[in-house]
Amino acid sequence: MNNELILVLDFGGQYNQLIARRVREANVYCEVLPYNSSIDKIKSKNPKGIIFTGGPASVLDPKAPICDREVFELGIPILGICYGMQLMSHMLGGTVEKAEQREYGKVNITFDTSSMLFEGIEKESTCWMSHTYYVNNLPEGFVKCADTPNCPVAAIENREKKLYGVQFHPEVVHTPKGRDILNNFLYKICGCSGDWKMASFIEHSINSIREKVGDKKVLCALSGGVDSSVAAVLVHKAVGKQLTCIFVDHGLLRKYEGDQVEEVFKKQFDISLIRVNAEDRFLEKLKGVTDPERKRKIIGEEFIRVFEEEAKKIGTVDFLVQGTIYPDVIESGVGDAAVIKSHHNVGGLPDYIDFKEIIEPLRSLFKDEVRKVGIELGIPEDIVMRQPFPGPGLAVRVIGEVTKEKVDILRDADYIFREEIKNAGLDREINQYFAVLTGMRSVGVMGDERTYDYTLALRAVTTIDFMTADWAKIPYDVLEKVSNRIVNEVKHINRIVYDITTKPPATIEWE
């Protein structure tokens, strides 16, 4: 693709992916590279602009991460964020000191609106700060263009060289004008035109896959999740019947999910799909197993065995499709290691299946972009907007040993919970919600008779990035309806509890 490009140099900040996503959301393509990328690599990308991320280090530390000094001589606009601004100042002759008072959280800020970076933005606003050091002397040619009560230099610019820095974080939602500031950098300073669109990505991908594959065979492991579903449909658009998808149904999916996968991909898209009903096989392997990590390992290994058996029936395939997405690439360190990480995306399949090359059509996309591509391709919203679901499925939402009875109980209860959340119009407000069958039984009374049945936990969270999460404040009347339906419609559950723990200290999943 020949899209205009912004490079994000990663100095270890927690928001590096968020910065890249914000740039993409502004219809500008961007890539994340390590801070120590060579100047030749940077030049080869021909970027319209460069963004330095924040980071946990101090520029005063001799071992602090620094970029190639030549990057400032390329004549390309640069925006330094937090550590990125301090680094720019430090490398160009300014000075940085430790602040007497650390700034963390939302603070008031005053912008110099004559700066191109803050053009069209109200002079007084708020921003999100997270720093211990600050710039106290500016490099030659720079001027201050923002300040806060405790940070006299909250933003700097060298208009002639198009070098800009902000001490705050424009990429987070807690900086109300952050997107406007980033847009000013992208469009007014870098001169981007906004040519990153999903429709053009799809067209380019189809042509590229078609050219690469020719008349060869392609194989895809289809789970019914967002990434594998979108990857499969995109590849099918390119090569049609040359693609075969294998859907290993381990019997641990949510209610009706396996049938929906078959209905959508076989009937709607006319994809050559092999559904392997392997519930008995997986449950047999899980007998007596209570440790969640052992469950995961057993299911992962058995999945590979089943897939391998089915793949051998097809014969030699030339290409294996994987749903690797851009965060996988970034987290693996960007570069050769990215391929190694991607191999584990479908449980290590490339180590077992005879193929020549991997196709990763979504490798450059973030999850929200994958969903947009899915919508453009006509995949039903129920699949495209599907919530995160663990690979081992309901096995890690049954606490303790997994049996068919327990899975069936949980599947029915979980379906009611999800159905009532959707009926209440909360399905897009709550980022993830599900039921957990605890290993605990308790005494109850139903129809004047004593019961001794399972306790079911409900979990629902709101989150921006799934790194931290808050429990969802579901209205009591909705919870009451869910509880009444489950105890009346699902056998062997006589008590419902609602998990009101944040992450941290808890994780979102129970196992």
Swiss-Prot record:
GO cellular component: cytosol
The reaction(s) this protein catalyses: XMP + L-glutamine + ATP + H2O = GMP + L-glutamate + AMP + diphosphate + 2 H(+)
Binding, ATP: S223, G224, G225, V226, D227, S228, S229
PROSITE patterns on file: GATASE_TYPE_1, GMPS_ATP_PPASE
Domain Glutamine amidotransferase type-1: from-to ranges: 5-195
EC nos: 6.3.5.2
This protein's UniProt keywords: ATP-binding, Glutamine amidotransferase, GMP biosynthesis, Ligase, Nucleotide-binding, Purine biosynthesis
UniProt GO molecular function: ATP binding; GMP synthase activity
The keyword Protease appears for this protein: no
Transmembrane segments: none
Enzyme active site: C82 (nucleophile), H169, E171
Pathway(s) this gene product operates in, as recorded in its UniProt entry: Purine metabolism; GMP biosynthesis; GMP from XMP (L-Gln route): step 1/1
All copies of domain GMPS ATP-PPase, residue ranges: 196-386
Subunit relationships: Homodimer.
NCBIfam families: guaA_Cterm (TIGR00884), guaA_Nterm (TIGR00888), PRK00074.1 (NF000848)
Free-text function comment from the UniProt entry: Catalyzes the synthesis of GMP from XMP.
HAMAP family per UniProt: GMP_synthase (MF_00344)
Name of this protein: GMP synthase [glutamine-hydrolyzing]
Organism: Acetivibrio thermocellus (strain ATCC 27405 / DSM 1237 / JCM 9322 / NBRC 103400 / NCIMB 10682 / NRRL B-4536 / VPI 7372) (Clostridium thermocellum)
